Amino acid sequence: MRLVHRLSILAASVALPLSAHAQSTVTLDTVVVEGAGGSGAGGTFGTATGPVDGYVATQTQTGSKISTPLIELPQSISVVTTQQMEDRGVQNIGEALNYTSGVVTQPFGNDPRFFAPIIRGFEATDSLYINGFRFIRDFGALAFEPYGFERIEVLKGPASVLYGQGAPGGIINLVQKRPTFTEFRNVEAEIGNNSRYVAKFDVGGVYNEDVSYRMVGLGRLSETQMNYVDDDRVYLAPSISFRPDADTSFTLMGSLQYDKADSPVGLPQAGTLDGNPYGRIPPSLYLGEPDFNDSESWFGTIGYEFSHRFNEAVEFRQNAQYTRLDFNYQNLYFSGLGADNFTVARGPSVQDELTNSFGIDNQVETRFETGVLQHTALIGLDYRQNNLDRSSNFSGTALPINAFDPVYGCLLYTS
């Protein structure tokens, strides 16, 4: 009975189109749909570097240096969009990537001074890119401002063919906000715990049909959960785009970030994670020296992106970027808890670093067909120069401090 029942349904389904075919043909009126993929003339929404409507990006340049649909790339690429960062209220790049598979974002805890991710088990501090250019640093890592970026893209797995020497775990590319040839104004103010006050703005406009501009800025005064550890920042990122015709585009971008973020120093295990005969050590305890410990950094970028399409088959692109990091740091770090379970040994650390980096990337993209197959080929030549000046001093001694009755100002430091 079950077999007959299935055959009867199949027969009925075959008969339906035959019955419909026998009816008279009805001609419907023509409907014309008009629209544009961008936001006005020269719009950038939905492109590989422009804003994304929602959480799901469809295009990327990180995986191939060509604007390519994500679904067509063999690599594993995760994209965190501006909308997702805003809805989650992220405060740093680590929080933005917390839900990205294969990425450990804060292996040293929430240290406001720097961002030190791990991708697929490999340290990726030296695999950070800004607009496709590698961020070069030594000791002076940096905590980038997420509000200044349109998207954060993680390419997992080796990428040396496109980007040169790097960690096998993958890279993180931070894509800066650019002009969109639309008018918008966004001004926000935030108040949070730990005396956190933030003011930020994102303003864009159109000067004429060929020129668009954008300015992103942020100012922050903030303490942290640990006493005497501040997390202050000033950030500015201007940009301007010039598009004289449909085939030519030139975008000039810059950014300047000043951070005054102190080191959390650290706390002993006995009294925090484990028990201590003298009681619990509060997470707000500061074991450094407020009048000695200091950390500040200046970080700036300036660069451009130029593209010209000669015809439907050939396009030339040239991107260049200069970055400068000036990092100054001195600190008494926690070096161990004594056998008495309350005396904390401390050691001095003084670091000064100045890094200058310049890179230029030339690309020629060609499109051609062989029979029914369509091809896109990329030929490129890039140049990079890095200069690093660094001084480090770990010599000297410092007086210990009582973890349960700290007295600051008793500093003995000799270098």
Language-model region placement:
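Short, acidic, small-residue-rich periplasmic hinge/interaction motif at the N-terminus
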Residues: 22-83
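Extracytoplasmic beta-strand/coil segments of soluble accessory domains associated
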Residues: 55-78, 82, 88, 94-134, ...
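Non-catalytic regulatory/gating segments with a bias toward low-complexity or hydrophobic composition
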Residues: 77, 85, 97, 152-157, ...
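Short acidic/polar hinge/loop motifs at secondary-structure boundaries
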Residues: 105, 116, 133-156, 175-176
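Outer-membrane beta-barrel translocator/receptor signature
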Residues: 147-150, 161-238, 244-248, 300
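Transmembrane beta-barrel strands of outer-membrane/channel proteins
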Residues: 187-191, 215-219, 252-258, 318-324, ...
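Outer-membrane beta-barrel channels and translocator barrels
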Residues: 208-210, 243-247, 311-313, 365, ...
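Acidic/polar loop-and-plug regions of large Gram-negative outer-membrane beta-barrel proteins
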Residues: 220-224, 234-309, 313, 324-355, ...
